Amino acid sequence: MAARVCCQLDPARDVLCLRPVGAESRGRPVSGPFGPLPSPSSSAVPADHGAHLSLRGLPVCAFSSAEPCALRLTSARRMETTVNAHQVLPKVLHKRTLGLSAMSTTDLEAYFKDCLFKDWEELGEEIRLKVWRL
């Protein structure tokens, strides 16, 4: 079964955060191929929107002023392989940072639901960790 997440744009940092719906923060940060990324500042994230850290492998958006925005998506089952995706999402996030018109948050939600979770849960795609880095 696919994880339930909501996409939220944090205007203070201009990053897209994916949060587990109705979940408490019990997860652990996931280390990707670029090393561990710091979690976003909790002061910019309202408490009632759930965790910003990975919860049993749910998506994470990590940001640091010293690093590019990295959106890491993992399936709940395993995280053995990595791919740098050459898809539309990095371009969309880059446009947001430049103040250009880009995909709406609703469209991004549909992108994750239709593309990523469908690949993992319905098609059984074996790549379990996707990393985009701007």
From Swiss-Prot:
Post-translational modification (record): A fraction may be phosphorylated in insect cells and HepG2 cells, a human hepatoblastoma cell line. Phosphorylated in vitro by host protein kinase C or mitogen-activated protein kinase. N-acetylated in insect cells.
Keyword terms, alphabetized: Activation of host NF-kappa-B by virus, Activator, Apoptosis, Host cytoplasm, Host G2/M cell cycle arrest by virus, Host mitochondrion, Host nucleus, Host-virus interaction, Modulation of host cell cycle by virus, Transcription, Transcription regulation
Any one cellular-component term (Gene Ontology): host cell mitochondrion
Spans through the membrane: none
Region (Mitochondrial targeting sequence): 68-117
Pfam families: X (PF00739)
Domain of life, per lineage: Viruses
Biased composition (Low complexity): 29-47
GO terms for biological process, alphabetical: DNA-templated transcription; symbiont-mediated activation of host NF-kappaB cascade; symbiont-mediated arrest of host cell cycle during G2/M transition; viral genome replication
Region (Disordered): 25-48
Keyword Transcription regulation: yes
Subcellular location: Host cytoplasm; Host nucleus; Host mitochondrion
Family: Belongs to the orthohepadnavirus protein X family.
Function: Multifunctional protein that plays a role in silencing host antiviral defenses and promoting viral transcription. Does not seem to be essential for HBV infection. May be directly involved in development of cirrhosis and liver cancer (hepatocellular carcinoma). Most of cytosolic activities involve modulation of cytosolic calcium. The effect on apoptosis is controversial depending on the cell types in which the studies have been conducted. May induce apoptosis by localizing in mitochondria and causing loss of mitochondrial membrane potential.
Subunit structure: May form homodimer. May interact with host CEBPA, CFLAR, CREB1, DDB1, E4F1, HBXIP, HSPD1/HSP60, NFKBIA, POLR2E and SMAD4. Interacts with host SMC5-SMC6 complex and induces its degradation. Interacts with host TRPC4AP; leading to prevent ubiquitination of TRPC4AP. Interacts with host PLSCR1; this interaction promotes ubiquitination and degradation of HBx and impairs HBx-mediated cell proliferation.
Name of the protein this chain belongs to: Protein X
